[in-house]
């Protein structure tokens, strides 16, 4: 089953994106480079709980 997760900017902590993640296949937290409108540049976004 897939669950909805939120991605937060590593620098400012702003929660900018939501996405779906498979429970079974990925044990570690997701880490993606995406655009942060608060920082005004591309930053690393981490999965939040």
Curated annotation (Swiss-Prot):
InterPro entries in the record: Ribosomal_bL33 (IPR001705), Ribosomal_bL33_CS (IPR018264), Ribosomal_bL33_sf (IPR038584), Ribosomal_zn-bd (IPR011332)
PROSITE patterns on file: RIBOSOMAL_L33
Gene Ontology biological process terms, A to Z: translation
Gene3D superfamilies on file: Ribosomal protein L33
MF-aspect GO terms: structural constituent of ribosome
Gene Ontology annotations for the cellular component aspect, listed alphabetically: cytoplasm; ribonucleoprotein complex; ribosome
Entry keywords, A to Z: Ribonucleoprotein, Ribosomal protein
Family of this protein: Belongs to the bacterial ribosomal protein bL33 family.
Protein name: Large ribosomal subunit protein bL33A
Organism of this sequence: Bacillus pumilus (strain SAFR-032)
Lineage: Bacteria, Bacillati, Bacillota, Bacilli, Bacillales
């Amino acid at each position: 089953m897939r669950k909805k997760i939120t991605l937060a900017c590593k620098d400012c902590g702003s929660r900018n994106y939501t996405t779906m993640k498979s429970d079974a296949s990925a044990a570690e937290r997701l880490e993606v480079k995406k655009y942060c409108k608060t920082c005004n540049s591309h930053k690393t976004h981490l999965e939040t709980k």
